[in-house]
Amino acid sequence: MAYVNLVTGGAGFIGSHLCEALLNRGEEVLCLDNFFTGRKVNIAHLLGNSRFEIVRHDVVNPIIIEADRVFNFACPASPVHYQHNPVKTIKTNVMGALNMLGLAKRVGARILQASTSEVYGDPTVHPQVESYWGNVNPVGPRSCYDEGKRVAESLFFDYHNQNKVDIRVIRIFNTYGPRMLVNDGRVVSNFVVQALKNAPISIYGEGGQTRSFCYVSDLVDGILRMMDRDGFHGPVNLGNPGEFTILQLAELVIELTGSKSKIEYHPLPENDPTRRRPDISLAREKLGWEPVVPLREGQTEERA
Protein backbone atom coordinates (compact mmCIF):
# COMPACT_ATOMS: atom_id res chain seq x y z
CA MET A 1 0.00 0.00 0.00
CA ALA A 2 1.30 3.47 -0.91
CA TYR A 3 0.72 5.63 2.15
CA VAL A 4 0.34 9.39 2.35
CA ASN A 5 2.97 10.43 4.91
CA LEU A 6 3.07 13.72 6.79
CA VAL A 7 6.62 14.47 7.96
CA THR A 8 6.85 17.44 10.32
CA GLY A 9 10.31 18.95 10.39
CA GLY A 10 10.76 17.36 6.97
CA ALA A 11 13.31 19.92 5.77
CA GLY A 12 15.61 19.21 8.70
CA PHE A 13 18.64 16.93 8.85
CA ILE A 14 16.90 13.66 9.74
CA GLY A 15 13.51 14.67 8.32
CA SER A 16 14.89 15.25 4.83
CA HIS A 17 16.52 11.82 4.75
CA LEU A 18 13.24 10.31 5.93
CA CYS A 19 11.29 12.10 3.17
CA GLU A 20 13.76 10.76 0.62
CA ALA A 21 13.45 7.19 1.92
CA LEU A 22 9.64 7.32 1.85
CA LEU A 23 9.66 8.55 -1.74
CA ASN A 24 12.06 5.76 -2.65
CA ARG A 25 9.42 3.33 -1.36
CA GLY A 26 6.90 4.77 -3.81
CA GLU A 27 4.90 6.61 -1.15
CA GLU A 28 3.53 10.16 -1.02
CA VAL A 29 5.14 12.73 1.26
CA LEU A 30 3.79 15.97 2.70
CA CYS A 31 6.83 17.78 4.09
CA LEU A 32 5.74 20.24 6.77
CA ASP A 33 8.32 22.73 8.08
CA ASN A 34 8.50 26.30 9.38
CA PHE A 35 12.16 26.56 8.26
CA PHE A 36 13.35 27.73 11.67
CA THR A 37 16.21 25.23 11.48
CA GLY A 38 15.11 23.26 8.40
CA ARG A 39 16.60 24.27 5.06
CA LYS A 40 15.12 24.22 1.57
CA VAL A 41 18.45 23.01 0.19
CA ASN A 42 17.93 19.75 2.10
CA ILE A 43 14.85 18.93 0.03
CA ALA A 44 15.59 20.79 -3.22
CA HIS A 45 16.41 17.53 -5.00
CA LEU A 46 12.95 16.18 -4.14
CA LEU A 47 10.93 19.06 -5.60
CA GLY A 48 10.58 17.48 -9.03
CA ASN A 49 8.88 14.40 -7.59
CA SER A 50 5.12 14.50 -8.15
CA ARG A 51 4.60 12.55 -4.90
CA PHE A 52 6.35 15.24 -2.82
CA GLU A 53 4.78 18.43 -1.52
CA ILE A 54 6.06 21.15 0.84
CA VAL A 55 3.73 22.74 3.38
CA ARG A 56 5.14 25.78 5.18
CA HIS A 57 3.61 25.60 8.66
CA ASP A 58 4.52 25.78 12.34
CA VAL A 59 3.29 22.81 14.38
CA VAL A 60 2.50 25.02 17.37
CA ASN A 61 -0.60 25.90 15.34
CA PRO A 62 -3.24 23.30 14.37
CA ILE A 63 -3.54 22.26 10.74
CA ILE A 64 -6.28 20.48 8.80
CA ILE A 65 -4.69 17.94 6.50
CA GLU A 66 -5.22 14.32 5.46
CA ALA A 67 -2.55 11.65 5.95
CA ASP A 68 -2.29 7.93 6.62
CA ARG A 69 0.86 8.24 8.70
CA VAL A 70 2.45 11.09 10.65
CA PHE A 71 6.14 11.35 11.54
CA ASN A 72 6.55 14.10 14.15
CA PHE A 73 10.12 15.39 13.83
CA ALA A 74 9.50 19.13 14.23
CA CYS A 75 11.76 20.60 16.92
CA PRO A 76 15.16 22.30 17.13
CA ALA A 77 17.51 19.48 18.13
CA SER A 78 20.83 21.19 18.81
CA PRO A 79 21.82 23.19 21.90
CA VAL A 80 22.66 26.29 19.84
CA HIS A 81 19.11 26.48 18.53
CA TYR A 82 17.02 25.26 21.43
CA GLN A 83 18.87 27.35 24.03
CA HIS A 84 18.60 30.45 21.83
CA ASN A 85 14.81 30.28 22.16
CA PRO A 86 13.87 27.89 24.98
CA VAL A 87 10.21 28.96 25.11
CA LYS A 88 9.81 28.28 21.39
CA THR A 89 11.51 24.92 21.86
CA ILE A 90 9.24 23.65 24.61
CA LYS A 91 6.16 25.02 22.81
CA THR A 92 7.18 23.14 19.67
CA ASN A 93 7.62 19.93 21.65
CA VAL A 94 4.40 20.15 23.64
CA MET A 95 1.99 22.05 21.37
CA GLY A 96 3.38 20.29 18.32
CA ALA A 97 2.73 16.91 19.90
CA LEU A 98 -0.80 17.94 20.92
CA ASN A 99 -1.66 19.24 17.46
CA MET A 100 -0.26 16.24 15.61
CA LEU A 101 -1.95 13.81 18.00
CA GLY A 102 -5.22 15.66 17.49
CA LEU A 103 -4.76 15.35 13.74
CA ALA A 104 -3.97 11.64 13.99
CA LYS A 105 -7.03 11.11 16.17
CA ARG A 106 -9.31 12.91 13.69
CA VAL A 107 -8.13 11.10 10.57
CA GLY A 108 -7.24 7.73 12.12
CA ALA A 109 -3.55 7.98 11.22
CA ARG A 110 -0.68 6.06 12.76
CA ILE A 111 1.72 8.56 14.33
CA LEU A 112 5.38 8.30 15.31
CA GLN A 113 7.08 10.62 17.80
CA ALA A 114 10.77 11.38 17.37
CA SER A 115 11.88 11.45 20.99
CA THR A 116 15.47 11.52 22.14
CA SER A 117 18.14 10.02 24.35
CA GLU A 118 18.01 13.34 26.20
CA VAL A 119 15.00 11.98 28.12
CA TYR A 120 17.60 10.00 30.10
CA GLY A 121 19.45 13.20 31.09
CA ASP A 122 22.82 12.49 32.72
CA PRO A 123 22.13 8.79 33.22
CA THR A 124 23.03 6.76 36.28
CA VAL A 125 22.28 3.53 34.38
CA HIS A 126 24.65 2.43 31.61
CA PRO A 127 23.93 1.54 28.87
CA GLN A 128 20.49 3.12 28.86
CA VAL A 129 17.48 0.81 28.59
CA GLU A 130 13.96 1.98 27.79
CA SER A 131 12.73 1.13 31.30
CA TYR A 132 15.16 3.64 32.85
CA TRP A 133 13.30 6.80 33.90
CA GLY A 134 16.24 9.17 33.57
CA ASN A 135 18.13 11.76 35.59
CA VAL A 136 17.04 15.14 34.21
CA ASN A 137 17.40 18.63 35.66
CA PRO A 138 13.94 20.18 35.12
CA VAL A 139 15.20 23.78 35.44
CA GLY A 140 18.61 23.60 33.74
CA PRO A 141 19.68 25.18 30.43
CA ARG A 142 18.81 21.97 28.53
CA SER A 143 15.44 21.39 30.21
CA CYS A 144 13.36 23.08 27.49
CA TYR A 145 14.39 20.27 25.15
CA ASP A 146 14.76 17.36 27.57
CA GLU A 147 11.54 17.96 29.48
CA GLY A 148 9.67 18.99 26.34
CA LYS A 149 10.42 15.60 24.83
CA ARG A 150 9.45 13.82 28.05
CA VAL A 151 6.08 15.62 28.08
CA ALA A 152 5.57 14.74 24.41
CA GLU A 153 6.14 11.05 25.20
CA SER A 154 3.59 11.26 28.00
CA LEU A 155 1.06 12.89 25.68
CA PHE A 156 1.54 10.17 23.09
CA PHE A 157 0.82 7.41 25.57
CA ASP A 158 -2.08 9.37 27.07
CA TYR A 159 -3.67 9.70 23.62
CA HIS A 160 -3.08 6.01 23.01
CA ASN A 161 -4.54 4.89 26.33
CA GLN A 162 -7.49 7.29 26.37
CA ASN A 163 -8.30 7.71 22.67
CA LYS A 164 -6.78 4.58 21.10
CA VAL A 165 -4.51 6.60 18.81
CA ASP A 166 -2.07 4.23 17.08
CA ILE A 167 1.25 5.63 18.32
CA ARG A 168 4.94 4.81 17.94
CA VAL A 169 7.69 6.37 20.09
CA ILE A 170 11.40 6.19 19.28
CA ARG A 171 14.31 7.57 21.28
CA ILE A 172 17.01 8.80 18.92
CA PHE A 173 20.65 8.83 20.05
CA ASN A 174 23.44 10.93 18.49
CA THR A 175 23.09 10.84 14.71
CA TYR A 176 25.35 12.20 11.99
CA GLY A 177 25.61 12.31 8.22
CA PRO A 178 25.09 14.55 5.17
CA ARG A 179 22.96 17.70 5.60
CA MET A 180 23.92 18.35 9.20
CA LEU A 181 24.03 22.08 9.87
CA VAL A 182 27.64 23.18 10.20
CA ASN A 183 26.81 25.73 12.90
CA ASP A 184 24.36 23.75 15.02
CA GLY A 185 26.73 23.16 17.92
CA ARG A 186 26.61 19.36 17.81
CA VAL A 187 29.87 17.61 18.36
CA VAL A 188 30.33 15.82 15.02
CA SER A 189 29.63 18.87 12.86
CA ASN A 190 31.72 21.07 15.16
CA PHE A 191 34.75 18.81 14.91
CA VAL A 192 34.52 18.35 11.13
CA VAL A 193 34.19 22.08 10.44
CA GLN A 194 37.07 22.93 12.77
CA ALA A 195 39.26 20.19 11.30
CA LEU A 196 38.64 21.24 7.70
CA LYS A 197 39.69 24.79 8.62
CA ASN A 198 42.75 23.50 10.53
CA ALA A 199 41.29 25.41 13.46
CA PRO A 200 41.62 24.22 17.07
CA ILE A 201 39.27 21.35 17.95
CA SER A 202 37.16 22.43 20.93
CA ILE A 203 36.64 19.76 23.58
CA TYR A 204 34.50 20.62 26.58
CA GLY A 205 35.71 18.94 29.74
CA GLU A 206 38.59 16.48 29.59
CA GLY A 207 37.21 14.54 26.62
CA GLY A 208 36.44 11.42 28.63
CA GLN A 209 32.67 11.76 28.33
CA THR A 210 31.22 9.22 25.91
CA ARG A 211 28.69 9.25 23.09
CA SER A 212 27.41 6.74 20.54
CA PHE A 213 27.17 7.87 16.94
CA CYS A 214 24.64 6.44 14.48
CA TYR A 215 24.83 7.12 10.74
CA VAL A 216 21.64 8.66 9.40
CA SER A 217 20.84 5.88 6.91
CA ASP A 218 20.87 3.34 9.74
CA LEU A 219 18.57 5.55 11.80
CA VAL A 220 16.08 6.02 8.95
CA ASP A 221 15.95 2.26 8.47
CA GLY A 222 15.05 1.89 12.15
CA ILE A 223 12.40 4.62 11.93
CA LEU A 224 10.67 2.92 9.00
CA ARG A 225 10.80 -0.48 10.67
CA MET A 226 9.18 1.00 13.77
CA MET A 227 6.42 2.71 11.79
CA ASP A 228 5.72 -0.50 9.87
CA ARG A 229 5.66 -2.70 12.98
CA ASP A 230 2.15 -3.65 14.09
CA GLY A 231 1.27 -4.05 17.75
CA PHE A 232 4.37 -2.39 19.23
CA HIS A 233 4.22 1.19 20.46
CA GLY A 234 7.61 1.66 22.15
CA PRO A 235 9.41 3.53 23.40
CA VAL A 236 12.42 2.00 21.69
CA ASN A 237 16.03 3.16 21.53
CA LEU A 238 17.48 3.79 18.07
CA GLY A 239 21.20 4.41 18.09
CA ASN A 240 24.58 2.82 17.59
CA PRO A 241 25.74 0.93 20.70
CA GLY A 242 29.39 1.53 19.82
CA GLU A 243 30.74 3.90 22.49
CA PHE A 244 33.47 6.48 21.90
CA THR A 245 34.98 9.18 24.08
CA ILE A 246 34.78 12.70 22.75
CA LEU A 247 38.58 12.72 22.58
CA GLN A 248 38.55 9.57 20.43
CA LEU A 249 36.07 11.22 18.07
CA ALA A 250 38.24 14.33 17.79
CA GLU A 251 41.33 12.25 17.02
CA LEU A 252 39.43 10.25 14.38
CA VAL A 253 38.16 13.39 12.65
CA ILE A 254 41.67 14.87 12.59
CA GLU A 255 43.02 11.64 11.11
CA LEU A 256 40.35 11.26 8.41
CA THR A 257 40.52 14.90 7.31
CA GLY A 258 44.31 15.07 7.36
CA SER A 259 43.90 18.15 9.52
CA LYS A 260 46.64 20.06 11.31
CA SER A 261 44.23 21.04 14.07
CA LYS A 262 45.28 20.94 17.69
CA ILE A 263 42.93 20.10 20.53
CA GLU A 264 41.83 22.82 22.95
CA TYR A 265 40.02 22.09 26.20
CA HIS A 266 37.22 24.23 27.62
CA PRO A 267 34.99 24.04 30.73
CA LEU A 268 32.22 21.45 30.54
CA PRO A 269 28.72 22.99 30.11
CA GLU A 270 26.16 22.57 32.87
CA ASN A 271 24.22 19.27 32.86
CA ASP A 272 26.23 17.84 29.94
CA PRO A 273 25.85 14.03 30.18
CA THR A 274 29.03 12.15 31.06
CA ARG A 275 28.05 8.85 29.40
CA ARG A 276 25.53 8.09 26.68
CA ARG A 277 25.09 4.70 25.02
CA PRO A 278 21.89 2.90 23.98
CA ASP A 279 20.92 -0.61 24.86
CA ILE A 280 19.27 -1.69 21.59
CA SER A 281 18.16 -5.16 22.69
CA LEU A 282 14.51 -4.16 22.29
CA ALA A 283 15.07 -2.82 18.77
CA ARG A 284 16.81 -6.05 17.81
CA GLU A 285 13.96 -8.12 19.26
CA LYS A 286 10.96 -6.13 18.02
CA LEU A 287 12.28 -4.60 14.80
CA GLY A 288 15.10 -6.88 13.73
CA TRP A 289 17.19 -3.72 13.58
CA GLU A 290 20.74 -2.77 14.37
CA PRO A 291 23.08 -0.26 12.73
CA VAL A 292 25.57 -1.48 10.15
CA VAL A 293 27.68 1.61 9.32
CA PRO A 294 30.78 1.91 11.54
CA LEU A 295 31.90 5.37 12.68
CA ARG A 296 35.02 5.45 10.52
CA GLU A 297 33.05 4.61 7.36
CA GLY A 298 30.23 7.00 8.23
CA GLN A 299 32.63 9.88 8.79
CA THR A 300 34.09 9.28 5.35
CA GLU A 301 30.59 9.22 3.79
CA GLU A 302 29.56 12.39 5.60
CA ARG A 303 32.25 14.44 3.91
CA ALA A 304 31.88 12.82 0.47
Locations of regions flagged by a protein language model:
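Short, surface-exposed alpha-helical segments at coil->helix boundaries
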Residues: 40-41, 153, 189, 247, ...
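Residue-level signature of the cytosolic catalytic core of signaling kinases
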Residues: 48, 180-184, 242, 291
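N-terminal Rossmann-like NAD(P)+-binding domain of SDR-like oxidoreductases, especially those catalyzing
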Residues: 1-175, 217, 289
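A glycine/serine/threonine-rich, flexible loop-to-helix segment
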Residues: 126-127, 182-190
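Short, conserved glycine- and acidic-residue-centered signature motifs
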Residues: 93, 148, 184-185, 276
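C-terminal substrate-binding subdomain of Rossmann-fold SDR/epimerase-dehydratase oxidoreductases
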Residues: 5, 18, 24, 57, ...
